[in-house]
Amino acid sequence: DTQPAEWNDYWTKLSTLAAGNSLPECLQMDYSYLAQYVAADLLVDLTPYVENGTLDVSNVSEGIQDASSIDGKMYAVCAGVNAPALFYNKTLLDSLGITVKDNMTVDEFESIAREVYEKSGVKTDLPYSAGDNYLPYAMRAHGVTKLFNEDSLNVTDAASLVPGFQIYEDGVKDGWVIGADVHAELTSNSVEQSPLVYFSSEATQSWCGFFWSNQLSAMVAAAPEGMEIGI
């Protein structure tokens, strides 16, 4: 018997179950929450089951196993891996004669965003709540390859951080970035409520969205009829 839920609702529900000591025997976990649940002694150490052969992870790479482990103990079995992805309205961009290439720089992305806005009035949706994925990529363009060190942000001054936030300020001021006021009325991180597929006007519509590669099928399903989603 499974009990699926939308992303935010899922973690709220799981937290409630954890507080009541009534977590299910098997649950889906995310890397960003793993340490928190282990620290609260809510997850079983699976290492003995790997060692006695009950769990066969021989075909799982060491790096993937490490992602499921805390302090050398395995607390989860990886169900799959994915990567941050840019989804975009291919139908719109094709009509505007704009091509999205792989491995864009931040400057190239901004150039496309401005061109889309100038030609169509459609804006760009930059991550607000999911900025922990976007910000490291923006910072990497300025030589910062790791967001945090052991004690703090892995920067000596704000110079490396500013460009990642400056694009928001400049974009909102110039009109091509969707403002936080639009997101305030949406469910955070929801595919179905992404401005890429959920909008009422050009002011609330985006030509793109930052998500995870394994959410492509959900985004395609949520897209309005006639909209092709590119990745």
Question: Which residues make up each language-model segment?
Answer:
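Short, solvent-exposed loop/beta-turn-alpha elements that line the ligand-binding surface or hinge
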Residues: 47-60, 102, 125, 145-166, ...
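Glycine-centered hinge/linker elements that transmit conformational signals in sensory
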Residues: 113-114, 153-190
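Short glycine- and hydrophobic/aromatic-rich loop-to-beta-strand nucleating segment
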Residues: 84-88
